[in-house]
């Protein structure tokens, strides 16, 4: 503990009220946020002799000063604690990083409504169904909806531009309302059925379709009756495949497993009695954190994250009981201004769902631990091969990607002792070099990475360069220049491809001595190097392809006076692509919404000139 902090003197100033405390280190960074019903009693517990918890010992040793905020109640303290944790992200708190907005299915408010994937602010008028646990679940649902209900999924611009049915009509996945192939009444009926289906009311949809089929048969409209029959059969098949509960309400079921410092919260989103989707969360847990704190922190941060658009049910079922469960119920209920209950002792369908969630959480932790142990073993072997005196904590790898010098992109990927650390990945768009000059590209990328490096910054222990001696020398020169005034510099290693680019034949080159060596093809240390090299390669190629596609799609059209992003999008969507725009006549260009005869002539002349 810092000599500047006098615990006894501080504790004499603390009241026994409810409140929140923030612990700071010598750099004035918040390292821990906590709450208490009795601040004096809680804070005194940190400064007892013979603290048993290793995490608490480490925390106390870094305290420089403590700030206290009093609250009216313990519920207020819980809410304020959550706000402070989000604001400061303290290193000794359990942190849930859940910053992505959740996707929805949108049923738009339109003469002929469309079904669409939606993520972000809900500005467009219509009904939003969700949230879904991830984008894949939404796309899978939309794909299924196309087979069940012939409702359009195209955007409004494409819809307006149609003069004949598109391929989806030929595949019986859309009824082509854009060109009048279906009456408004029939289309509206399908929209209502789709809406009921998305609300989980399958049997109501099937009953309605059975009535329509029988009515069509009575009128001897056998072709229409057959279509309803096929739709009913498809719906029944889907309903059989979905696990359904007798409980028709909404709830979240949370299975928890915590082992060897890894916590997994596996959530089943139950909506209208069906498993709407599932998702695993892995909060960052400081060493030696007890289970109660992990549970409390997750519930608080997950259900009070106002930045995420999430539909919160009235009921949550969780696999573990914990000390402050009822206080959390009250805090979340007050914050949301709605009834909110947390249950642990459940039966029947709820118990079945809970067993499933716990099984998934347990399997996820076992898999992560296995992966973590494998990566750890590879790090240890690499340290032995390189004869390092200190453990490797951070590795980075650079790669360059381009097509004949076009749209050059450099990647920098980061690995720690748990594997890829994707939040630290970076891409660099390379500008101002001779196309195809990989040396200049590497020089620019490494220079930009270490331009503002300083002591205490994120310095890799090892920096891999995906390339031969020439690129390695360029990178080593830059590193020598940037780190001349610092005590620590990364060890550079070039990874030169072997004969025929076959894995296992790589040559490794040390940047400082230019000594080259190889490892056995089955060496776990080589597998680690190949992993970071391949990840860097993948990340560079993805960035290059995105940049190249954007350049090819935009530069030709947007260089034409009067063509901005909206008109470019209209041209590409209406005509099908850049090549089709280039081959279009003036008469065809005029048919695109927003393109006048003069503009069409300008586009035609510019692309043919």
UniProtKB/Swiss-Prot annotation:
SMART domains: GIYc (SM00465), HhH1 (SM00278). GO terms for molecular function: DNA binding; excinuclease ABC activity. GO terms for biological process: nucleotide-excision repair; SOS response. Residues 16-94 form the GIY-YIG domain. It comes from the Bacteria. Keywords: Cytoplasm, DNA damage, DNA excision, DNA repair, Excision nuclease, SOS response. One of its GO terms (cellular component) is excinuclease repair complex. InterPro entries: GIY-YIG_endonuc (IPR000305), GIY-YIG_endonuc_sf (IPR035901), GIY-YIG_UvrC_Cho (IPR047296), Hlx-hairpin-Hlx_DNA-bd_motif (IPR003583), RuvA_2-like (IPR010994), UVR_dom (IPR001943), UVR_dom_sf (IPR036876), UvrABC_protein_C (IPR050066). The keyword DNA-binding does not apply. Residues 203-238 form the UVR domain. It is found in: Cytoplasm. HAMAP family: UvrC (MF_00203). PANTHER family: UVRABC SYSTEM PROTEIN C (PTHR30562:SF1), UVRC/OXIDOREDUCTASE (PTHR30562). The UvrABC repair system catalyzes the recognition and processing of DNA lesions. UvrC both incises the 5' and 3' sides of the lesion. The N-terminal half is responsible for the 3' incision and the C-terminal half is responsible for the 5' incision. Belongs to the UvrC family. Interacts with UvrB in an incision complex. This is UvrABC system protein C. It comes from Shewanella baltica (strain OS155 / ATCC BAA-1091).
């Amino acid at each position: 503990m810092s000599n500047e902090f006098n615990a006894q003197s501080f504790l004499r100033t603390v009241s026994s009220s409810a409140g929140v405390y923030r612990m700071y280190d010598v750099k004035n960074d918040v390292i821990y946020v906590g709450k208490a019903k009795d601040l004096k009693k809680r804070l005194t517990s940190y400064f007892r002799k013979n603290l048993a918890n290793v995490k608490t010992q480490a925390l106390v040793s870094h305290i420089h000063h403590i700030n206290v905020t009093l609250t009216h109640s313990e519920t207020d303290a819980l809410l304020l604690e959550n706000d402070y944790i989000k604001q400061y992200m303290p290193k000794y708190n359990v942190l849930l990083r859940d910053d992505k907005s959740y996707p929805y299915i949108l049923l738009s408010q339109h003469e002929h409504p469309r079904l669409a994937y939606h993520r972000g602010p809900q500005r467009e008028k219509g009904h939003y169904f969700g949230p879904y646990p991830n984008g894949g679940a939404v796309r899978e649902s939309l794909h299924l909806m196309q087979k069940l209900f012939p409702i359009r999924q195209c955007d409004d611009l494409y819809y307006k531009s149609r003069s004949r049915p598109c391929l989806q009509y030929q595949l019986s996945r859309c009824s082509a309302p854009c060109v009048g192939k279906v009456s408004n009444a029939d289309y509206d009926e399908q929209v209502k059925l789709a809406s009921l289906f998305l609300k989980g009311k399958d049997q109501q949809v099937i009953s309605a379709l059975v009535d329509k089929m029988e009515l069509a048969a009575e009128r001897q409209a056998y072709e229409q009756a057959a279509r309803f029959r096929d739709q009913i059969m498809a719906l029944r098949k889907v309903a059989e495949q979905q696990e359904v509960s007798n409980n028709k309400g909404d709830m979240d079921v949370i299975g928890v497993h915590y082992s060897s410092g890894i916590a997994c919260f596996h959530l089943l989103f139950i909506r209208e009695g069906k498993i709407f989707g599932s998702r695993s969360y892995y909060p960052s847990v400081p060493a030696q954190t007890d289970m109660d704190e992990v549970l409390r922190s997750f519930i608080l941060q997950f259900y009070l994250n106002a930045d995420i658009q999430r539909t919160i049910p009235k009921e949550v079922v969780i696999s573990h009981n914990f000390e402050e469960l009822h206080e959390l119920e009250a805090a979340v209920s007050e914050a949301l201004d709605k009834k909110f209950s947390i249950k642990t002792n459940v039966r029947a369908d709820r118990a079945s769902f809970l067993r499933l969630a716990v099984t998934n959480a347990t399997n996820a932790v076992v898999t992560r631990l296995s992966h973590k142990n494998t990566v750890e073993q590879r790090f240890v072997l690499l340290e032995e091969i390189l004869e390092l005196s200190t453990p490797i904590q951070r590795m980075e790898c650079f790669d360059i990607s381009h097509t004949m010098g076009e749209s050059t992109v450099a990647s920098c990927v980061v690995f720690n002792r748990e594997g890829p650390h994707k939040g630290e990945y970076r891409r660099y768009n390379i500008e101002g070099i001779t196309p195809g000059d990989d040396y200049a590209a590497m020089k620019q990328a490494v220079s930009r990475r270490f331009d503002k490096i300083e002591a205490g910054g994120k310095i890799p222990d090892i920096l891999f360069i995906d390339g031969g001696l020439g690129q390695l020398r360029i990178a080593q020169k830059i590193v020598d220049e940037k780190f001349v005034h610092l005590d620590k510099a990364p060890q550079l290693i070039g990874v030169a491809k072997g004969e025929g680019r076959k894995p296992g034949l790589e040559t490794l080159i040390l940047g400082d001595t230019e000594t080259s060596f190889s490892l056995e093809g089955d060496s776990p240390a080589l597998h680690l190097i190949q992993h970071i090299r391949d990840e860097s390669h993948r990340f560079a190629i993805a960035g290059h392809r995105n940049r190249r596609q954007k350049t090819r799609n935009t530069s030709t059209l947007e260089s034409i006076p009067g063509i901005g992003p909206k008109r470019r999008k209209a041209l590409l969507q209406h005509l099908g692509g850049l090549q089709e725009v280039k081959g279009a006549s003036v008469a065809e260009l005029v048919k695109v919404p927003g393109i006048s005869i003069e503009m069409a002539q300008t586009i035609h002349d510019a692309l043919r000139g």
